[in-house]
A protein has these predicted regions:
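Nucleotide-state sensing region of NTPase/ATPase domains
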Residues: 48-131, 135-147, 204-209, 241, ...
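Long, charged N-terminal accessory/stalk domains
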Residues: 123-124, 130-179, 183
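Conserved adenine-binding aromatic site and its adjacent loop/helix in ATP-hydrolyzing domains
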Residues: 41, 138, 294
Length: 295
């Protein structure tokens, strides 16, 4: 896979950019705050339609304008692809591949696979489950289109459920829809748990040897996926996981109503790592994090 060129309009700090890349190795350099990371973020966005540091697409649009544009010319699968993303403040984004509008971001899967490493990746060790879930989502979305579809649907359902829990005391009729949203969230959530658990298992097969080499043979790394307590085997099929997620939802139903917060589901899952029997601590130099239990 080769990124041949990149064009940006009103993306982050770029009013307009046209860049052509060498098919081998490219070194991006410049002053602080000049836009190096923004450029790499744009390339990665064409891979998954997700940003490693922005929760909402509007965060990537330059202040004072209504939309941004990202376009990349890519060589992949022995074919040329033109990938485009149009971001809008007041409307849904639009994704295009070779002039054809894509229905979902999952259709980008496999066209441009990227690996992005940045200082924020240390949050995988130093911070909580949210950073780890973002890492999983970014990686799996490139490999499994069905995962991206399930994740988008789950996030949509989650936003609806949050509004129900927030407003039900002022509008009791909202409670009649809660069970339906719980069922649909459990159905998509079962797929998410299944895919995440299998990804961590594959990571566990290769990451320890790499970590051992980096540490000069002094440390051993192990990874373990954790989900809600009622799921006995996250590697099981989605049909097996579904009733276990429903059980967890039911057990937390009253607590959710009382707190007006969503307390159950894959949104609460994470994964843990151990290095030579210890876990990361919250504060340490960037070169080597210290250790404490991760959530």
């Amino acid at each position: 896979m080769i990124v041949k060129s990149l064009e940006l309009d009103f993306f982050r700090n770029y009013v307009h950019l046209e860049a052509v890349f060498d098919p081998r190795v490219n070194l991006i350099y410049g002053d602080n705050a000049q836009g190096k990371t923004n450029l790499l973020e744009a390339v990665a966005y064409l891979s998954t339609a997700r940003s490693h540091r922005a929760r909402y697409d509007r965060e990537m649009i330059m202040l004072g304008v209504d939309g941004a544009f990202v376009k990349g010319e890519v060589r992949s699968r022995d074919r040329d692809f033109t990938l485009e993303a149009r971001l809008n403040r007041g409307a849904r984004r639009q994704l295009w591949s070779n002039g054809v509008r894509l229905k979902t971001a999952g259709e980008l899967s496999g066209i441009l696979n990227t690996v992005l490493f940045c200082p924020e990746d240390l949050y995988l060790i130093r911070e909580g489950g949210a950073a780890r879930r973002r890492f999983l989502d970014s990686a799996i979305c490139q490999l499994r289109p069905r995962y991206e579809q399930a994740l988008s649907e789950y996030n949509r359902l989650y936003d609806h459920k949050v509004r129900i829990l927030r407003d039900w005391q002022e509008n009791l009729s909202l409670l009649s829809t809660l069970d339906d949203f719980n069922l649909r969230m459990a159905q998509t959530g079962a797929l998410i748990v299944h895919y995440r658990a299998h990804f961590i298992r594959r990571l566990q097969e290769s990451a320890p040897a790499i970590h051992r080499d980096f540490s000069g043979g002094k440390e051993e790394l192990s990874l373990r996926y954790e989900t809600v307590s009622t799921v006995t085997d996250p590697l099981a099929g989605a049909k097996t996981i579904l009733p276990q997620l429903l059980e967890h939802q039911q057990a937390h139903r009253q607590a959710e109503l009382d707190s007006r917060q969503c307390l159950s589901g894959p949104i609460r899952t994470t994964w843990q790592w151990r290095s030579t029997g210890t876990r990361p601590r919250p504060t340490a130099p960037r070169g080597r994090p210290a250790r404490r239990p991760s959530p």
